[in-house]
Amino acid sequence: LFAGLDAAPDRPAPALVAMNEKCSHHDGGQLAYLLITSRGSMLISGSAGYWRGIFDGLRPDVALLSLGGRPNVDGEPFQGSSVDYMLEQVTLLRPGRVAFCHHDPLFPGLPGVDIEPAAAALQVPGASAGYFAMEYATPVPLFG
Protein backbone atom coordinates (compact mmCIF):
# COMPACT_ATOMS: atom_id res chain seq x y z
CA LEU A 1 0.00 0.00 0.00
CA PHE A 2 2.74 2.47 0.93
CA ALA A 3 5.54 0.94 -1.16
CA GLY A 4 5.86 4.02 -3.38
CA LEU A 5 6.44 6.52 -0.56
CA ASP A 6 10.20 6.54 -0.96
CA ALA A 7 9.95 7.15 -4.71
CA ALA A 8 7.36 9.95 -4.47
CA PRO A 9 8.59 13.19 -6.09
CA ASP A 10 7.14 15.30 -3.27
CA ARG A 11 7.69 14.61 0.40
CA PRO A 12 4.69 12.57 1.70
CA ALA A 13 2.65 13.85 4.63
CA PRO A 14 4.18 12.87 8.01
CA ALA A 15 1.00 10.99 9.00
CA LEU A 16 1.26 8.82 5.89
CA VAL A 17 4.92 8.07 6.60
CA ALA A 18 4.05 7.17 10.21
CA MET A 19 1.29 4.78 9.08
CA ASN A 20 3.77 3.04 6.79
CA GLU A 21 5.43 1.47 9.84
CA LYS A 22 2.17 0.53 11.60
CA CYS A 23 0.53 -1.86 9.15
CA SER A 24 1.20 -4.85 6.97
CA HIS A 25 2.00 -4.46 3.30
CA HIS A 26 0.76 -7.99 2.62
CA ASP A 27 -2.72 -8.49 4.10
CA GLY A 28 -4.80 -6.20 1.87
CA GLY A 29 -5.30 -3.66 4.62
CA GLN A 30 -8.26 -2.61 6.70
CA LEU A 31 -11.05 -0.50 5.30
CA ALA A 32 -11.61 2.31 7.81
CA TYR A 33 -12.46 5.98 7.57
CA LEU A 34 -12.33 8.66 10.25
CA LEU A 35 -14.81 11.37 9.31
CA ILE A 36 -14.34 14.66 11.13
CA THR A 37 -17.14 17.21 11.00
CA SER A 38 -17.94 20.40 12.85
CA ARG A 39 -20.44 18.40 14.97
CA GLY A 40 -18.18 15.47 15.85
CA SER A 41 -16.11 12.60 14.49
CA MET A 42 -17.11 9.14 13.31
CA LEU A 43 -14.94 6.08 12.70
CA ILE A 44 -16.35 3.70 10.10
CA SER A 45 -14.51 0.38 10.36
CA GLY A 46 -15.65 -1.91 7.55
CA SER A 47 -13.60 -4.95 8.55
CA ALA A 48 -13.66 -7.15 11.62
CA GLY A 49 -10.08 -6.35 12.40
CA TYR A 50 -7.73 -3.49 13.17
CA TRP A 51 -4.11 -2.59 13.81
CA ARG A 52 -3.48 -1.19 17.28
CA GLY A 53 -0.81 1.15 15.93
CA ILE A 54 -3.37 2.85 13.70
CA PHE A 55 -6.43 2.84 15.99
CA ASP A 56 -4.50 3.75 19.15
CA GLY A 57 -4.99 7.44 19.82
CA LEU A 58 -8.14 7.82 17.72
CA ARG A 59 -11.01 9.09 19.85
CA PRO A 60 -14.09 9.16 17.63
CA ASP A 61 -17.36 10.45 19.04
CA VAL A 62 -19.17 7.65 17.18
CA ALA A 63 -17.80 4.29 16.01
CA LEU A 64 -19.46 2.09 13.39
CA LEU A 65 -17.76 -1.27 13.95
CA SER A 66 -17.95 -4.46 11.91
CA LEU A 67 -18.92 -7.64 13.72
CA GLY A 68 -19.06 -9.95 10.69
CA GLY A 69 -16.44 -12.57 9.92
CA ARG A 70 -13.43 -13.76 11.90
CA PRO A 71 -11.87 -10.76 13.68
CA ASN A 72 -8.15 -10.15 13.72
CA VAL A 73 -5.93 -7.75 15.62
CA ASP A 74 -2.54 -6.71 14.26
CA GLY A 75 -2.90 -9.26 11.46
CA GLU A 76 -3.46 -12.23 13.79
CA PRO A 77 -6.75 -14.08 14.43
CA PHE A 78 -8.45 -12.78 17.58
CA GLN A 79 -8.66 -15.36 20.36
CA GLY A 80 -12.00 -14.90 22.07
CA SER A 81 -15.65 -14.20 21.39
CA SER A 82 -17.05 -11.45 19.18
CA VAL A 83 -18.14 -9.69 22.39
CA ASP A 84 -14.57 -9.82 23.75
CA TYR A 85 -13.27 -8.47 20.43
CA MET A 86 -15.79 -5.63 20.34
CA LEU A 87 -15.12 -4.66 23.97
CA GLU A 88 -11.35 -4.61 23.35
CA GLN A 89 -11.84 -2.38 20.32
CA VAL A 90 -14.21 -0.05 22.21
CA THR A 91 -11.73 0.15 25.11
CA LEU A 92 -8.98 1.17 22.68
CA LEU A 93 -11.08 3.75 20.79
CA ARG A 94 -13.21 5.10 23.67
CA PRO A 95 -16.08 6.36 21.46
CA GLY A 96 -19.14 7.92 23.04
CA ARG A 97 -21.54 5.83 20.93
CA VAL A 98 -21.24 2.56 18.99
CA ALA A 99 -23.29 0.89 16.25
CA PHE A 100 -22.50 -2.31 14.37
CA CYS A 101 -22.21 -3.04 10.65
CA HIS A 102 -21.58 -6.05 8.38
CA HIS A 103 -23.42 -8.41 10.68
CA ASP A 104 -26.59 -8.91 8.65
CA PRO A 105 -27.28 -11.50 5.91
CA LEU A 106 -26.81 -8.88 3.18
CA PHE A 107 -25.63 -11.37 0.57
CA PRO A 108 -27.72 -14.52 -0.09
CA GLY A 109 -26.05 -17.63 1.24
CA LEU A 110 -24.10 -15.85 3.97
CA PRO A 111 -25.56 -16.08 7.46
CA GLY A 112 -25.98 -13.08 9.68
CA VAL A 113 -24.20 -12.62 13.00
CA ASP A 114 -26.05 -12.45 16.31
CA ILE A 115 -25.16 -9.00 17.64
CA GLU A 116 -27.41 -9.16 20.72
CA PRO A 117 -24.64 -10.22 23.17
CA ALA A 118 -22.37 -7.41 21.94
CA ALA A 119 -25.20 -4.86 22.04
CA ALA A 120 -26.17 -6.03 25.55
CA ALA A 121 -22.56 -5.56 26.75
CA LEU A 122 -22.81 -1.87 25.78
CA GLN A 123 -26.22 -1.39 27.39
CA VAL A 124 -25.27 -2.25 30.97
CA PRO A 125 -24.97 0.58 33.51
CA GLY A 126 -21.45 1.98 33.50
CA ALA A 127 -20.59 0.73 29.99
CA SER A 128 -17.76 2.69 28.40
CA ALA A 129 -19.82 3.53 25.29
CA GLY A 130 -23.50 3.74 24.46
CA TYR A 131 -24.99 1.41 21.84
CA PHE A 132 -27.43 2.53 19.18
CA ALA A 133 -29.10 0.40 16.51
CA MET A 134 -29.42 1.33 12.87
CA GLU A 135 -32.08 0.17 10.42
CA TYR A 136 -32.01 0.13 6.63
CA ALA A 137 -32.89 3.45 4.99
CA THR A 138 -33.70 5.08 8.33
CA PRO A 139 -31.91 8.32 9.26
CA VAL A 140 -30.08 8.22 12.58
CA PRO A 141 -28.89 11.28 14.52
CA LEU A 142 -25.20 10.59 15.11
CA PHE A 143 -24.13 13.44 17.36
CA GLY A 144 -25.95 14.70 20.44
Feature annotation, model-predicted:
Residues 1, 69-70:
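Active-site/binding-pocket entry motifs
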Residues 47-48, 67-69, 103-104:
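Active-site metal-binding loops of divalent metal-dependent hydrolases
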Residues 1-57, 78, 141-144:
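Core dinuclear metal-dependent hydrolase active-site scaffold
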